Regions:
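Generic recognition of stable, solvent-exposed alpha-helical segments in well-folded globular domains
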Residues: 6, 33-36, 103-110, 126, ...
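Hydrophobic alpha-helical scaffolding
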Residues: 1, 27, 31, 47, ...
Length: 167
C-alpha cells in the first residue's frame, strides 16, 4: 500500500471510544478494543528494510464521529451507527461512529496541515522530528526505543497542540 512509499507518513489507529449510544438510545460495543488502546485492526511496523520507521504516529481512528451521507446506498445499513442528527439551513445531516485507519489518517493529515500553515517551510524530516518530540506516550503506548518509537504506535499518539508549538 501507499504506506510503503519512502516518504509517506504511515498512521496507526487508536480507539477514541470503545462504546457508543445511537439515535435510538441503544448502546453498542464498537468491537475495536479498549478506549485509548491501539485499534485491533491497526497494522504494526516496522517496514522491513526501510530506514524510515513506520508507523510514524498513531491517530484517533477507532470509534470516531464522522459525517454520514443520506445519499449513500449504504445509509440504511448504518442506521445503528448513527449518533447525531442535525437540522440546519433546511437540510438534515447525520453523523455516526466509524472506525478505520481511514479515520485516523485524515485526522493526522489535518494536524500536519495545521503545522504547515504555521510553518510552510517544514520538511518531511521536520514533521517526523515534531512527532518524535511531542508524541504522547501513555500506558497504552508502553516502552519505546532510544528514538521514542515502537512498532505498534510509532512515536506515540499525535499531539496537535504541542506539535503546533514546535512547528
Amino acid at each position: 500500500g501507499a504506506a510503503t512509499i519512502g516518504k509517506a507518513i504511515a498512521v496507526a489507529s487508536y480507539n477514541a471510544a470503545s462504546r457508543f449510544t445511537n439515535l435510538n438510545g441503544s448502546t453498542y460495543d464498537a468491537g475495536v478494543g479498549e478506549t485509548g488502546d491501539i485499534s485491533n485492526f491497526s497494522s504494526h511496523g516496522p517496514l522491513v528494510g526501510e530506514a524510515t520507521p513506520k508507523p510514524a504516529v498513531a491517530g484517533p481512528g477507532g470509534t470516531v464521529l464522522s459525517a454520514f451521507s443520506k445519499n449513500s446506498a449504504q445509509f440504511e445499513n448504518y442506521r445503528s451507527y448513527q449518533v447525531q442528527k442535525v437540522n440546519s439551513e433546511g437540510g438534515t445531516y447525520y453523523y455516526g461512529m466509524m472506525s478505520g485507519t481511514s479515520m485516523a489518517t485524515p485526522a493526522v493529515t489535518g494536524i500536519i496541515a495545521l503545522w504547515l500553515e504555521a510553518n510552510p517551510k517544514l520538511t518531511y524530516e521536520n514533521i517526523l522530528d515534531i512527532m518524535k518530540a511531542t508524541g504522547r506516550r501513555d500506558n497504552h503506548v508502553g516502552k519505546v526505543d532510544a528514538n521514542n518509537w515502537n512498532a505498534t504506535w510509532g512515536f506515540g499518539k499525535i499531539d496537535a497542540y504541542n506539535g503546533l508549538k514546535k512547528a
